[in-house]
Amino acid sequence: MFNLFEASLSRRSLIAAGAALGLAALAPAVLGNVNLTRRALADEAAKTVTITCLNGAKEAIELEVPFDPQRIAILDLASLDILDSLGVGDRVVGMASTSIDYLSTYSENTDLVPLGTIKEADLEAVMECEPDVIFIGGRLSSMYDDLSQIAPVVFLQTDTAADGKGVIESVRDNATTIASMFGLEDEIAGKMEAFDQRIAALQEFAAGKTAVVGMCTSGSFNVLGNDGRCSIIGREVGFDNVAAGAAAEQNGQDHNQGGSGEHGGKPEGTGKQGEGEGQDEGKSGSGEAVAAVTATHGNEASFETIVSLDPDYVFVMDRDAAIGTEGAQLAREIMDNELVQSMRAAQDNHIVYLEHPNVWYTAEGGITALDYMLADLEQGLGLSE
């Protein structure tokens, strides 16, 4: 005889069993969706990275930037140099003009948007190329806020101030920072190890030797100190720059007349970097003493002064050749006079002309630039293989 209660119970059991089976079947899908969500969140977090760089006031800041950016705007040649060395130069969509030979692949690429110069950016052009990130140098710090409205701005400096980290450590730190944006930090260590070995060989050669370091510009010879341009010669390589004191003394007088510059400064308003100019030394506006620094283009010195210093070596950087000044007198012509030729350094063939002045002047701080700079010194000193 049919039992209604048992039948009802049986139906409830079947329904419960079916529900249990359904939940069991759904569980992997639900858990899978949860895991997918977690992975998506993790992937999203991995799309940005936090780096340390400078803001428009030259203060160190933590900046969140895209990880592995695909569209890069370049307004700093040292940064382009580093990106090129890391093999990610194909991400560049716009750049400032340059005449540096080893960057000609970029300057001659008509697909790249011209963005102005390293001194003055074309904001409309920068917006046009729709960058994920923008790299700038010292001369564009005043445009930092405007550029930041377009994309994150990475402002790195070559810290050649008198009490700064110097060229080598600046390259190491800046290259590592840029590499971290692509997960390529390990590549920098190997590159810098080779540079460290070359610096050590140059240091061994320079030990106990004196030098005058200078820049030829507008027909004159300007002495440089152990900061700013060419500071690697007196600081990292270790030549005793016998003109450094005179440069600082004269620059202190200039500073009190209100001079200022841009190259090789430190964060927090004490100067600027890379392709920029030198900063002046003496006293701050409050009358407090500040660190000795070299002026924008060094300090003009008479040839009598250079002769009286009687250095073992004279290093010469040709500014007019670096910037392509038409009709300018070349450094070799300026230095070809009786006073200079009477010097012991000239008679010993120890006047070293830096063969790639545009690299020294506009791209200092890059990896390939450092290679060229060290090669100029090695060749000039007879150390090249």
Regions from the PLM with identified roles:
Residues G56-E59, L115-D122, E249, V293-F303:
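Short helix-initiation/N-cap motifs at beta->coil->alpha
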Residues D101, D227-N256, G282-H297:
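Alpha-helical, coiled-coil/dimerization segments enriched in small aliphatic residues
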Residues M143-G219, G276-S284, H350, V359-E385:
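Extracytoplasmic substrate-binding proteins
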